[in-house]
């Protein structure tokens, strides 16, 4: 922990198309090597695919997907007397958002569709319905926390 004053979080500018900070954050998560225009094309392309495939509002699907994938608890390693314990801890809200977006990105990258936009659209639609690889990851993290509930008294 730093001993100086706490540095304030920077506000993320909302994206130009949907005026949403969450979409803007997601574009930043998708971005590789600073290529923001490519990331925007992927995310907006995925939203177009969602509109075409499911004829639903892409923002609602995106919000539902992120909300469904958000983890409530995770495990952190804690060393106590020569043994490492996986201690379940609650996830703070900002980290929940970051983890869910990261898991959606990774799940989309592992899919088999042709373009990244199609893969992302497929993963977002599945996550919004409570299915998909990102949801599987969330359940896995929750299962780990449940299995290690006995060590919760070692909280940080």
Curated annotation (Swiss-Prot):
SUPFAM superfamilies: Ribosomal protein S7. It comes from the Bacteria. PROSITE patterns: RIBOSOMAL_S7 (PS00052). Signal peptide: none annotated. GO terms for biological process: translation. Keywords: Ribonucleoprotein, Ribosomal protein, RNA-binding, rRNA-binding, tRNA-binding. One of its GO terms (molecular function) is tRNA binding. InterPro entries: Ribosomal_uS7, Ribosomal_uS7_bac/org-type, Ribosomal_uS7_CS, Ribosomal_uS7_dom, Ribosomal_uS7_dom_sf. HAMAP family: Ribosomal_uS7_B. Belongs to the universal ribosomal protein uS7 family. This is Small ribosomal subunit protein uS7. It comes from Azoarcus sp. (strain BH72).
């Amino acid at each position: 922990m730093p001993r100086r004053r706490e540095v304030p979080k920077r506000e993320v500018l909302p994206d130009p198309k949907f005026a949403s900070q969450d979409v803007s954050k997601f574009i930043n998560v998708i971005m590789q090597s600073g290529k923001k225009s490519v990331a925007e094309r992927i995310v907006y392309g995925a939203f177009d695919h969602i509109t075409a495939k499911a004829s639903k509002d892409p923002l609602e699907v995106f919000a539902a997907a992120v909300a469904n994938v958000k983890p409530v608890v995770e495990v952190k390693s804690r060393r106590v007397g020569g043994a490492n314990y996986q201690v379940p801890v609650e996830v703070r809200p900002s980290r929940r958002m970051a983890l869910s977006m990261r898991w959606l990105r990774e799940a989309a990258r592992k899919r088999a569709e042709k373009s990244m936009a199609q893969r992302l659209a497929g993963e977002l639609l599945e996550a919004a319905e409570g299915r998909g690889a990102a949801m599987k990851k969330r359940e896995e993290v929750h299962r780990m926390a449940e299995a290690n509930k006995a060590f919760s008294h070692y909280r940080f």
